[in-house]
């Protein structure tokens, strides 16, 4: 009995910690995509909305993506209608808005809940594992993910994507091979 208990205890602590690579999501076009496809990349995950005061951050996110994409950096944007109902459109509407208004070329995913009981499992992971942990406060909150899938930074909505704080954190992660 003691041997079984010790085995289970050791196995529990020896199990690898989950990472974003353990999740599958749907693209804005409805196709399944494993986040393990981004292994080895530095990833910025952002919850976005089309009718928010922070919506102009799409332009800054695109600049950020263009600046670092050739160095192994990607942005994954997840529309959500959870904050003030500021993303009421369909996935097709969102895609059209982002590409025509802001010229977005980084990856867009289907609209998902990012808080509450119906929160998408990816966001349940992000909000419980990031430092600080806790619910997202508003649209355009950002999670920086290392090349090995760990959360290494969390940036509030008001942090401009081209800010020194965020770009330095991205550059530090890109420098790690």
Range-by-range predicted roles:
Residues 54-120:
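Structural microenvironment flanking redox-active thiols in thiol-disulfide oxidoreductases
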Residues 39-44:
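Local sequence-structure signature of Cys/Sec-based thiol-disulfide redox active-site neighborhoods
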Residues 13-36, 121:
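N-terminal "domain-start" segment that seeds a small globular fold
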Residues 27, 47-51:
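Amphipathic alpha-helical repeat scaffolds
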Residues 4-13:
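Sec-dependent N-terminal signal peptides
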Residues 121-177:
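Thiol-/selenol-based redox modules, centered on thioredoxin-like
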């Amino acid at each position: 009995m003691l041997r079984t208990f010790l085995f289970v205890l050791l196995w529990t602590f020896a199990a690898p910690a989950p990472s974003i690579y353990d999740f599958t999501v749907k693209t804005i076009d409805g196709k399944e995509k494993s986040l393990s496809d981004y292994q080895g990349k530095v990833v910025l995950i952002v919850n976005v909305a089309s009718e928010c005061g922070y919506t102009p951050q799409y332009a800054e996110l695109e600049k950020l993506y263009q600046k670092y994409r050739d160095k192994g950096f990607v942005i994954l944007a997840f529309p959500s209608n959870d904050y003030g109902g500021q993303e009421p459109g369909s996935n097709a509407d969102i895609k059209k808005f982002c590409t025509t208004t802001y010229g977005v070329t980084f990856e867009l995913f289907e609209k998902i809940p990012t808080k509450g009981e119906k929160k998408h499992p990816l966001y349940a992971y992000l909000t419980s594992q990031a430092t600080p942990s806790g619910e997202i406060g508003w649209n355009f909150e950002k999670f920086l993910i290392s090349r090995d899938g760990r959360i290494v930074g969390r940036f509030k909505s008001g942090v401009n994507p081209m800010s020194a704080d965020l770009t330095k954190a991205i550059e530090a992660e890109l420098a790690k091979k």
